[in-house]
Amino acid sequence: MKKFFKILFFIVLLTILILWLVKIFLLTHKYQVKYYNEDKIEKDIVITFNGIYGTEKQLRFIDEKLAEDGYSVVNIQYPTVDDKIAEMTDKYIVPIIDEQVKKLNKINLERKVKNLPELKIHFVVHSMGSCLIRYYLKEHKLDNLGKVVLISPPSHGSQLADNPIADLLWYFIGPAVADMKTDKDSFVNQLGNPTYLCYVLIGDKSNNFLYSMLIKGEDDGMVPLATAKLNGSPLKTIKNTTHTSILEKQETVDEI
């Protein structure tokens, strides 16, 4: 019996160690901001940011394409495993938006003198990033807000967050996961429908059959298509793309 408990203790300890290493080396990414066309703002500003466990690399294809089209692009890579969604937004997203709004206001004053139309700020965000921008826009009003594009958004949560295992592993996967449960009282389901120009893009193909087994209905490997929808926001399915491969398709950029 003692031998059994020793083995069990070793297994539990090893599991915790593995989970801790996964969190530190695979799920945790540093805060950084990347600018495109920063000193040559002749078109609108587009702010982009990732979803949970994501990096700026995932949005690089979109960022570079938009920059090639002349937009001033600002990508925010932020840590996603330490805070809840509201805290992440206030800590990492708000300061950059404030920075860009201040810059845009100055530019628009100069353009007004020249009788040029005002420039706007748009947002292109992936997955959980949609929850951050919806929370931000619920709490703040932007006078020069343009288009908001939500890619693969868990607009009404995901069954993956409902799984009891997610509650047990909250320390390792991050407290923000609980914000994306599908029950009506969850954080994401308290954000309401957008009152601004908002579009939803989502894939229709899964590359993770284990996750798909936990999700009801058609999904993109992470998010159910049915719960991505938002009232009043047009939805476009990008065919043959998954939760992440959708970010590397020219069709996605064309829809933005």
List the predicted regions and their residue ranges.
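Membrane-interface motif at the C-terminal end of an N-terminal transmembrane signal
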Residues: 16-34
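N-terminal Sec-pathway targeting helices
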Residues: 1-17
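Serine-dependent carboxylesterase/thioesterase catalytic core
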Residues: 47-50, 57, 66, 73-76, ...
